[in-house]
């Protein structure tokens, strides 16, 4: 492992180390990719936590009940592996596959202003949640918002009418009273 960081703006968080596994330095990882095993397609990761940055290489990985179990190059001790708990797993944005014109990565949606069919500004997308049925956007108020309410909006075709990344706006079909 070395400590040469990528440019922070070029990195995308794709997972998180949450625990250790066994005594040989393996770590348990929660993957934000879909399917979760896609995280194993990236052989080099940048790890970040509380201002610390580390570059690591993936040796192997496999699925487990609560995510993935991963072996990193040069990490052979349980105590050393425990120190990585809480680290975000990042990859360069340039490694993400291209999407169709009407598809978006979550990171592209975060920060968009959310405006409904009545031109009411609800706020900005703060983050998204995976619920099983459909993804849910957490919209928090911002300057100029209709009110101070946090809203949970489904990320579905019925709700999301249009997305304009350049303008930083998402148009939705959603009543202000919901």
UniProtKB/Swiss-Prot annotation:
Q: Which NCBIfam families match?
A: 16S_RimM
Q: Which UniProt keywords apply?
A: Chaperone, Cytoplasm, Ribosome biogenesis, rRNA processing
Q: How does it assemble?
A: Binds ribosomal protein uS19.
A single GO molecular function, which one? Answer: ribosome binding
**Positions of transmembrane segments:** none
Return the domain comment text from this UniProt entry. The PRC barrel domain binds ribosomal protein uS19.
Q: Under what name is this protein listed? A: Ribosome maturation factor RimM
- Which lineage? Bacteria, Pseudomonadati, Pseudomonadota, Gammaproteobacteria, Pseudomonadales
Please tell me the species this chain comes from. Pseudomonas putida (strain ATCC 47054 / DSM 6125 / CFBP 8728 / NCIMB 11950 / KT2440)
The UniProt entry, under Pfam families, shows: PRC_RimM (PF24986), RimM (PF01782)
